[in-house]
Curated annotation (Swiss-Prot):
Coiled coil: none annotated. SUPFAM superfamilies: Isocitrate/Isopropylmalate dehydrogenase-like. InterPro entries: FA_synthesis, Phospholipid_synth_PlsX-like. It is an enzyme of class 2 (transferase). Keywords: Cytoplasm, Lipid biosynthesis, Lipid metabolism, Phospholipid biosynthesis, Phospholipid metabolism, Transferase. One of its GO terms (biological process) is phospholipid biosynthetic process. Homodimer. Probably interacts with PlsY. The keyword Ubl conjugation does not apply. One of its GO terms (molecular function) is phosphate:acyl-[acyl carrier protein] acyltransferase activity. This is Phosphate acyltransferase.
Length: 350
């Protein structure tokens, strides 16, 4: 049984979306059980409309719901112990749940997750990893918003975390890893990126294959299994890709309905267009995994509908089922066992 804690109050639509989506997950994942945290006055009317959900879930009333516009510091101070977001994360810490899912405020969710779960040994900052549809299938891109700016060591940490996720999710023994840069030549890019590349080459880990630098168009090509960058550029890339997918879908809809001949052509090519639409549907890959913590947390888009939130819940399910935490710890242990230790008395230039 996979136990999944749910922040029912998160997102733009709250229980009206988060709760019905769980029935979709239950149908596809019969060994899932849900620990639901939310305000009784808002969640109960929805639960009463979904009697089948009672068989696979337990509900806990929480007095506070973190708002989407709350600052992380406010969310931590203002009754965090009573909030549905905190309680859902705490269930993972206490061993009552295997993974936490929330569509709530990203900054608050990350702050609470770090405070409650803590980071793994030698990981300074967690990263948010997203699944990215590519020409070759799917890849992982991180960080997409947790860390604005990153030094070389943090980029190396992200590479290790991303490789562990690719190993767990895609069952790839040695995922290929690339550092996002303005060019593939070793002389290009910021010093932090170039130094991270040198460190990854020298580490020569058996758990990954360091490919080198990759450019923005390599993400969609699927040149590597894992693309590593800092959160500012990663978030812009993610939002740009999602917006472009919606833009192309809208162009296709307009083109297919413009003339009678276009509508007739669509009838004959309906299956192909349906496959394209499914491939470009951002709901299918909804969910960012918080990597580097001592527990698993998945962030859904705040605007997700039922199918989108269900995809985030199923992503969390897969992360538990595939042994993400154990594989991450093993990869980190291997790296730090090989990492050079500074001589006693050495002075850092940092």
């Amino acid at each position: 049984m996979i136990r999944i804690s749910i922040d029912a109050m998160g997102g733009d639509h709250g229980p009206e979306v988060t709760l019905p989506s769980l029935l979709r997950v239950a149908e596809r994942r019969p060994d899932a059980r849900f620990l639901i945290f939310g305000r009784e006055d808002e969640a109960r009317p929805v639960l009463d409309r979904l009697p089948a959900l009672a068989d696979v879930s337990d509900f806990t009333h929480c007095e506070v719901a973190v708002r989407m516009d709350d600052k992380p510091s406010q969310a931590l101070r203002n009754g965090r112990w009573k909030s549905s977001m905190w309680k859902a994360i705490e269930a993972v810490k206490d061993g009552e749940a295997d993974v936490c899912i929330s569509a709530g405020n990203t900054g608050a969710l990350m702050a609470m997750s770090k405070f409650c779960l803590r980071t793994m040994a030698d990981i300074e900052r967690p990263a948010i990893a997203a699944i990215w549809p590519t020409i070759r299938g799917e890849s992982i891109v991180l960080d997409v918003g947790a860390t604005i700016g990153a030094d070389a060591q943090q980029l190396v940490d992200f590479a290790i975390l991303g490789a562990a996720m690719a190993n767990a999710l895609f069952d790839i023994e040695r995922p290929t890893v690339g550092l996002l840069n303005v060019g593939v030549e070793e002389i290009k890019g910021q010093e932090e990126v170039k130094e991270a590349g040198r460190m990854l080459r020298e580490a020569a880990l058996e758990t990954m294959q360091y490919h080198g630098f990759v450019e923005g168009d390599d993400i969609g090509k699927g040149t590597v299994d894992v693309v590593v960058t800092e959160g500012f550029s990663g978030n812009i890339a993610l939002k740009t890709a999602e917006g472009t997918a919606r833009q192309i879908a809208e162009y296709l809809r307009a083109a297919m309905s413009r003339t009678l001949m276009a509508r007739i052509g669509y009838i004959f090519a309906r299956d192909a267009f349906q496959r394209l639409r499914e491939k470009m549907d951002v709901r299918r890959t909804n969910g960012g995994v918080f990597l580097g913590l001592k527990g698993i947390v998945v962030k859904s888009h705040g605007a997700a509908d039922e199918e989108g939130f269900a995809a985030a819940v199923e992503l969390g399910y897969e992360m538990v089922k595939s042994g993400l935490l154990d594989k991450t710890r093993a990869t980190l242990d291997l790296y730090h066992a090989r990492r050079p230790v500074a001589p006693a008395g050495a002075v850092s230039n940092a």
